[in-house]
Amino acid sequence: MIWNEILCLGDSITFGARDCYGRSYPAELGKMLTEKTNEFYYCHNHGISGETSSDLLKRSWNNISSKSNSNIMLLMIGTNDTQKNIPEHIYEDNLRQIISIAYVHNMYVVVGTL
């Protein structure tokens, strides 16, 4: 069986804080991909509740470097930026920098939003 790793970065939505069944979207995604293919998928959940894009940027290099076997990064961040009135240009710059770090590590990047 082939082993695939996906790195999921984000805030409480990624972490799964509001799921009444204690499941996160990374766990469910890994399960669904494994069931639909002949390959095993593991999604590393690096979601932290309350985190902004600035917080995520500060830890991105270590998170991305430590998951060098992952070739896909899913990024969902921004809810807390909105709630904390972080200017849009700062949010956009943070996303660009996070994505650039992933590109340095030869990752495909998927940016999600709500």
Predicted regions located by residue number:
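Serine-esterase "nucleophile elbow" of acetyl-processing enzymes
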Residues: 1-49, 54, 59-69
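Alpha-helical cap/lid subdomain in secreted, periplasmic
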Residues: 31, 39, 55-114
